[in-house]
Amino acid sequence: MKPNLNHRSNEPNCKGVEILSIGTELLLGNIVNTNAQWISEELSALGLNHFRQSTIGDNSKRISNLIKEISLRSDLLITTGGLGPTPDDLTTEAIAKSFNVTLYERESLWDEIKKKLSLSSSIQNNSSLKKQCFFPKDAQIIHNPRGTAPGMIWKPKKGFTILTFPGVPSEMKVMWKETAIDYIQKNFSDGYIFFSNTLNFSGIGESKVSEKIDNLLKLKNPTVAPYANLGELKLRITARATNELQAKNLIKPVKEELKKEFSKFIFGEDNETLSSVLIKELLKRKESLGFAESCTGGLLSSTITKVSGSSQVFKGSIISYSNELKQSLLNIPEDRIKKYGAVSEEIAQDMTINAREKLNSDWSIAISGIAGPSGGSKEKPVGIVYISIAGPNNHITNIKKIFSSTRNRVEIQRLSVNVCLNSLRLILLSKSK
């Protein structure tokens, strides 16, 4: 009988899946733990819930004790990290210690490592490399096509299974796809999957959205969950069903209700970004885009060019950070800058009009502001940003934003970029009607 890992019970004696990330560099925050996030999403796609994630440093005794604890409360443990040849790679040894078993050399694995590394005879007896070849006698090996550290699938006791993977994301992912998915589906899945569809919002906060969809947030299947990010909001709709089509049918009416309520604010779904949506719309209209940036210092350009295909619409950007460059590159008179100030609606508008002309683009966006932490005044505090958008038929849109002084410099820059892209998106949307 397969263990049921698909329930949502919160009872303390309820068993399930756990993820254990091993490595002092993760514990100290020197490296971001992307593996756990990725595995969590994979488990959801397989229809499994996991109830706990743990991170532990490179200490054999602590790892061993924690694995003993996990074996008492979970059916399946997935570990990442600690499988390499260095002294602080302790995972396999610690697991063996947890269950008081002996590790045995797999000679075929050593042959694989020698072949991969083309080892000279003087290095072939290197014990640190060879430690990667030792496993419990009855463990199933998960081969590593991209590295030297194999993982394993092992059942140390009835009702408990361990899957181990190296910490290198590219190695872990290919091993997972080639071995783990099939094993988990055969041994732990009850035929249900979780399928999610995410709606991406801009220009509206989480609290305002939540107020209007209180009834949807209480749904059990599908569930609706908000995830706020800097300047954006995601609503993830997740259904549990026997197949993807059934899940999509459960999600469909909820998605339609949300789109009806928030049509102006929803810019895309799933992995779509403001940049990708904007580029798609400009391509459809056969129109081009250029920027004149001051306080964002090129971040707006960097954001748009991260999207494949941006070269078909994006002409370029004039980074006029100093007043001198505003004069020489954008032809803004010195006396005009002195009169209104470099951070002003008037200068932002001059920047966008002149950038559009110089870059020969259909649309242009200019931005000038005070990102802080210094440089603000009572009249123009830190966080003030002026955005101006110019387009065909003498179109001009001017926007003034004052972001909270509690925001740091990078946050103000990122929020400013978000407003720029979303504002042009809304302008194009209004012209499409």
Swiss-Prot record:
Matching CDD domains: cinA
SMART domains found in the cross-reference section: MoCF_biosynth
Source organism superkingdom: Bacteria
Coiled coil stretches, renumbered: none
Pfam families associated with the record: CinA (PF02464), CinA_KH (PF18146), MoCF_biosynth (PF00994)
Cross-referenced Gene3D superfamilies: 3.30.70.2860, CinA-like, MoaB/Mog-like domain
InterPro entries: CinA (IPR050101), CinA-like_C (IPR036653), CinA_C (IPR008136), CinA_KH (IPR041424), Competence-induced_CinA (IPR008135), MoaB/Mog-like_dom_sf (IPR036425), MoaB/Mog_dom (IPR001453)
PANTHER family: NICOTINAMIDE-NUCLEOTIDE AMIDOHYDROLASE PNCC, NMN AMIDOHYDROLASE-LIKE PROTEIN YFAY
Family of the protein in this entry: Belongs to the CinA family.
Annotated protein name in UniProt: CinA-like protein
Organism classification: Bacteria, Bacillati, Cyanobacteriota, Cyanophyceae, Synechococcales
